[in-house]
């Protein structure tokens, strides 16, 4: 739950948002689960508009957030002091605070790879791939060639093709 509060002199807005992960590729989904008795429908619609109008950035790398459901669960307005821009600030603050509370984890990017090499270089390749923390499987021999498929951390495999070319002499 992220809570955003905006209350400078003669302004007031408070927004409570629930942030939930969605399956990969689902995009961002916004909805309201807030009672009209608690917050007027026009303010709820305004908050949903503010959520949709901006590309929100994550707190770890500043990358755009994806595949998340953001639900308005509560909000507060003041009859005399609330204006539309107040909810914009409170909404953005609620998203940011919710992301900070979410205990986000930065996932390491991985490459998928296929390596087809001669039998004589297999032990060197397997040694390298294990040292680079790769997961792989070895396919059947094909005319003195071995087919290795797997994946591993980008930071370890960035320049690995140069190593393969060097120890196989380009074969």
Located regions from the model:
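Accessory interaction regions appended to the cores of large information-processing enzymes
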Residues: 1-171
């Amino acid at each position: 739950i992220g809570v955003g509060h905006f209350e400078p002199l003669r302004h007031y807005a408070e927004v409570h948002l629930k942030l939930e992960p969605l399956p990969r590729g689902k995009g961002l989904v916004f909805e309201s689960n807030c009672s009209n008795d608690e917050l007027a429908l026009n303010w709820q619609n305004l908050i949903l508009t503010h959520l949709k109008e901006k590309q929100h950035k994550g707190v770890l790398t500043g990358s755009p957030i994806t595949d998340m459901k953001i639900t308005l669960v509560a909000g507060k307005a003041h009859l005399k002091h609330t204006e539309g821009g107040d909810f914009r600030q409170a909404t953005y603050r609620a998203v940011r605070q919710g992301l900070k509370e979410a205990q986000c984890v930065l996932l390491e990017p991985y490459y998928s790879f296929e390596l087809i090499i001669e039998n004589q270089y297999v032990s060197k390749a397997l040694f390298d791939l294990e040292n680079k923390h790769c997961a792989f499987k070895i396919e059947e021999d094909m005319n003195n060639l071995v087919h290795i498929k797997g994946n591993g951390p980008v930071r370890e495999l960035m320049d690995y093709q140069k190593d393969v070319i060097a120890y196989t002499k380009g074969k």
